[in-house]
Curated annotation (Swiss-Prot):
It is found in: Cell membrane. Interacts (via RsgI N-terminal anti-sigma domain) with SigI4. Residues 2-49 form the RsgI N-terminal anti-sigma domain. Residues 311-371 are annotated as: Disordered. Residues 371-522 form the CBM3 domain. Anti-sigma factor for SigI4. Negatively regulates SigI4 activity through direct interaction. Binding of the polysaccharide substrate to the extracellular C-terminal sensing domain of RsgI4 may induce a conformational change in its N-terminal cytoplasmic region, leading to the release and activation of SigI4. GO terms for molecular function: cellulose binding. This is Anti-sigma-I factor RsgI4. GO terms for biological process: carbohydrate metabolic process. The lineage of its organism: Bacteria, Bacillati, Bacillota, Clostridia, Eubacteriales. Gene3D superfamilies: Endoglucanase-like. The CBM3 domain binds to cellulose. It is a single-pass membrane protein. Residues 73-522 are extracellular.
Length: 522
């Protein structure tokens, strides 16, 4: 695979510049945008022709290329998909992840049979390493590898970097530990995370012996201490037994509990632990709403929009059932077989013509008439942990109607409890119509209901275009709080804790031009 940056898009073709400064024309993909880093192989390349690549050599494009080549060489973007580090995770399932410089998982390999079993259910490609590890923990709990009792469960993470620079090694360790520790501490299970950096030689030895880097380093440590351990026993023994009484891989914040609080000022890493815990105290929760008392009114649709949709449904249905308007007897012909409403205003002689007309609706009494718009929403959460700082959404919307749908008329709502008032941010990471065509805003459920006091409303720009009957649009999105406090998703109305693939999900509602077309409101 090769890496390139998109510098021009024209219909079904895109011009990219490679790491070596070459121009290539490739087939355009859904969601492609200027400046995007993409992977391509020779099959994607369109043969050069005078009308295609030739225009790339204009002065303007050449100037852009100079910038991109500088970015490649100076910022090291050539490592975008190249493996920057190998990270082995030992729980009992042992799995190795290959990640790029941005901490995105590019590949994964099981290191034992349990790892193979869990990896089959893991969605890891192009996901953040921290999220994948949390998902691995969740799957390990599901299969009983992590016990939900007072027993300590050790997770050993070992990493080998392709870079020899100590600063990069330190940065990688700090980011991974800082991101994972709070998430693991918030789980309702006793987990101790340990972390070690392995050398390239140690990784090579671990590969030769088909064991994780962490366990190979435990083997080396045992041999240095004169213990007669074999690699076979290392592989079969639990981490809790192997590391009993050992401080191997213990993270700085765990080494000194609270014996000498003075040392927390001397060691910056220990001070970090002390600063993490205040975010959990109720003080911060009180401060946040105090900063923004106007927050309820600032919410995009604390407005009656949410209520208006609900109330609009019931009156409409209520007026169609009664016979207020004799013009519409055909809406419910089966409920009044005598067709009294039809003969009431017409001459009795024409009553014989009325039944003939009532037979026609029986062909399609419930079918949508021509031009009717309807959708179906399929969904899953990419992270099923009940407590997390980020809520992920994978959504697939299908046009089930018989008319084109202007996506700018479509709104989707995901309902949840905010738990503690804070500003929130929405991000669309990818969409089949382009992430830049997806919008997100937050609103209040008024009055709040069981499992729902807030919703995120997903919309689409005018540029998103039309969705034809039978076609679908996919998107990967997420939202979080700006103060990085946690969500408890366990009781959230729209949370899907059981699936890792698309399922029809009626707890996300879909509206077309403000009318509910899919789902059940809380």
């Amino acid at each position: 695979m090769n890496l390139g940056v998109v510098i021009k898009i024209k219909r079904k073709k895109a011009i990219i510049v490679t790491e070596t400064g070459e121009f290539k024309a490739v087939n355009a993909r859904n969601g492609m945008f200027l400046g995007q880093k993409i992977l391509f192989d020779q099959q994607d390349v369109i043969e050069n022709n005078r009308n295609g690549i030739g225009l790339a050599y204009s002065a303007a494009i050449a100037g852009m290329v100079a910038v991109f080549v500088f970015m490649f060489t100076y910022f090291g973007l050539h490592n975008f998909n190249g493996t920057f580090a190998y990270v082995d995770v030992d729980i009992n399932p042992s799995v190795e992840f290959a990640v790029n410089r941005d901490g995105i998982v590019v590949n994964a390999e099981p290191l034992n049979d349990d790892g193979r079993k869990v990896l089959e259910e893991l969605i890891y490609k192009d996901a953040l390493l921290e999220d994948v590890i949390l998902d691995l923990v969740d799957k390990s709990r599901k299969y009983g590898f992590i016990e939900d009792n007072d027993r300590k469960n050790i997770i050993l993470i070992s990493a080998a970097l392709n870079s020899d620079e100590q600063e990069q090694r330190n940065d990688f360790e700090k980011k991974l530990v800082d991101n994972l520790m709070p998430e693991l501490e918030n789980l309702d299970v006793n987990i101790e995370m340990r972390f070690v950096i392995a050398s390239k030689e140690q990784r090579k030895k671990a590969q030769e012996n088909k064991v994780s880097m962490g366990k190979y380093m435990i083997y080396e440590m045992a041999r240095r201490q004169g213990e007669k351990l074999t690699l076979e026993s290392i592989m079969s023994e639990t981490l809790e037994n192997l590391l009993l009484g050992q401080d191997f891989g213990v993270i700085e914040t765990e080494k000194t509990p609270v014996n000498t609080p003075v040392k927390s000022t001397a060691t910056p890493t220990k001070a970090l632990a002390a600063e993490i815990t205040p975010t959990k105290t109720p003080e911060q929760v009180v401060m946040t709403p105090a900063n923004t008392p106007a927050k309820p009114t600032a919410a995009p649709t604390k407005a009656p929009a949410a209520v208006a949709v609900t109330s609009a449904k019931t009156p409409e249905r209520a007026t169609t059932v009664p016979v207020n308007t004799p013009v519409k007897p055909t809406d419910a012909p089966t409920k009044s077989p005598a067709t009294a409403t039809a003969t009431a205003t017409r001459a009795p002689v024409k009553a014989t013509a009325t039944p003939a007309k009532t037979l026609k609706p029986s062909d399609t009494p419930v079918k949508t008439p021509d031009g009717e718009q309807s959708v179906k929403v399929r969904f899953y959460n990419n992270n099923t942990l009940s407590e997390t700082g980020v809520i992920y959404m994978r959504i697939n919307v299908i046009n089930t109607g018989n008319a084109p749908l202007d996506l700018s008329d479509l709104k989707l709502r995901y309902y949840y409890t905010i738990d503690s008032e804070s500003e929130q941010r929405f991000n669309c990471d990818w969409s089949s119509i382009g992430a830049h065509n997806v919008t997100g805003s937050f609103g209040k459920v008024n009055p709040s209901r069981n499992g729902a006091d807030t919703y995120v409303e997903i919309g689409f720009t005018k540029e998103a275009g039309m969705l034809q009957p039978g076609e679908s649009v996919e998107l990967n999105a997420r939202f979080s709080k700006t103060d990085n406090t946690q969500y408890n998703k366990a009781d959230d109305y729209s949370f899907n804790s059981h699936y890792y693939e698309y399922v029809d999900w009626d707890r996300i509602t879909a509206y077309i031009s403000g009318i509910l077309k899919w789902g059940r409101e809380p």
